[in-house]
A protein has these predicted regions:
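N-proximal low-complexity "stem/linker" segments adjacent to membrane-targeting elements
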Residues: 1-30
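Hydrophobic targeting segments
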Residues: 7-12, 36, 44-47
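Short, acidic, metal-binding catalytic loop of nucleotide-sugar glycosyltransferases
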Residues: 28-43
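Active-site-proximal specificity loops/subdomain of glycosyltransferases
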Residues: 48-100
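Short aromatic/hydrophobic "clamp" motif used to bind/position activated sugar donors
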Residues: 106
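Active-site acidic Asp-centered loop
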Residues: 109-110
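Catalytic core and acceptor-binding pocket of nucleotide-sugar-dependent glycosyltransferases
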Residues: 115-123, 127-281
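Membrane-proximal basic amphipathic "stem/tether" segments
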Residues: 265-324
Length: 324
């Protein structure tokens, strides 16, 4: 079944100007909108941003000026100074935009990314096999390998998908983004003088892990609360890999047709990130044994780099923990 572009809405979420803590390439949101008009003619464009943002010259079909929830306090350092991340800004701009969608399919894209093709539309249905016991989405959701990490500090980790780009059924994207806002972390005076954050004194989860853990626990009550970055077990890793194979289609940016601004483009593929071949191997293992992919195929591209770099990353992390 082919998907007609008129059955797709594109939610562009985030700021269209720089603000404190978030730089912005001038004119990038104009470029994003123009690229959608070029590569998805007939699709509905929804720009979901903040009150006070200068949207002059932008021409989305729907413009949402959300009330800015502000940055979220997620930590305190030893001096009691708060650390903030844009958790709720991303949730509000994504979820409120998706709630305006009336088409069966939707794209969620950052306001500082853009399209270079529409290849992701066909790719969404190119891998139909599922592991029935692991299905949490109605259909597959296409996502991006950039910042989709399989390793951190030389160790395999779980629940760290990229949040740059999603394409799939609107109902499935809402499963990811329509989650409760995160409350500010309250300062605990009994822990004054020590860092306070989720998982302390172990290494805290990455922001993407915290997002993913929240929506995955909403979909499946058996998923544990992720206390720290490296929390893992053979059972949890297998669960995460089955989920990836059965519910996602993980593609390189060029396979999606996703354009990234310069600061997101590495000089070479990062060994700690998933690659499309990694995902294909999981898809073969859990969904479709007929897929032609092997571990040696991965070794020839990114595997040998991992063998060289990951052990050093692990040793460096262990030494850092000892110094603490």
């Amino acid at each position: 079944m082919s998907i007609d572009f008129k059955d797709i809405s594109v939610v562009i979420q985030g700021p269209v100007q720089a603000y404190q803590g978030r730089s912005q390439e001038p004119g990038i949101t104009h470029k994003c909108i123009a690229s959608i008009r070029t590569h998805l003619p007939g699709a509905t464009i929804i720009l979901s941003t903040w009150e006070g943002q200068d949207c002059h010259g932008l021409n989305p079909d729907i413009l949402l000026l959300n009330k800015d929830p502000g940055a979220t306090i997620v930590s305190y350092n030893a001096k009691g100074e708060p650390g903030k991340l844009n958790f709720n800004r991303q949730i509000v701009s994504s979820a409120e935009g998706l709630k305006q969608v009336t088409t069966p399919y939707a794209v969620k894209i950052r306001s500082d990314n853009f399209l270079t093709s529409n290849d992701f539309v066909a790719a969404q249905q190119a891998f139909p096999a599922r592991n029935d016991a692991s299905k949490l989405f109605t259909q597959k959701v296409v996502t991006n390998t950039s910042y989709f990490r399989r390793y951190a500090d030389g160790q395999k980790i779980v629940m760290l998908p990229s949040d740059f780009f999603h394409f799939g059924l609107t109902e499935d994207l809402l499963k990811i983004w329509d989650i409760p806002l995160f409350p500010d972390r309250e300062f605990d005076p009994t822990k004054a003088g020590s860092p306070q954050y989720r998982g302390a004194p172990k290494v805290g989860p990455h922001a993407e892990q915290i997002y993913c853990n929240a929506w995955l626990r909403k979909l499946d009550s058996t998923v544990p609360y992720l206390q720290h970055r490296h929390q893992n077990s053979p059972e949890l890793l297998a669960y995460w890999e089955r989920f990836i194979a059965s519910n996602l289609v993980v593609l390189e940016p060029e396979q999606i047709g996703l354009g990234l601004i310069q600061r997101f483009i590495p000089k070479s593929k990062r060994p700690n990130e998933i690659c499309h071949q990694d995902w294909l191997l999981l898809y073969k293992q859990y969904c479709d044994p007929s897929i032609a992919i092997s571990k040696f195929d991965i070794f020839k591209t990114i595997g040998w780099k991992r063998m060289c770099k990951l052990p050093f990353s692990y040793i460096k992390h262990q030494l850092t923990q000892i110094k603490k």
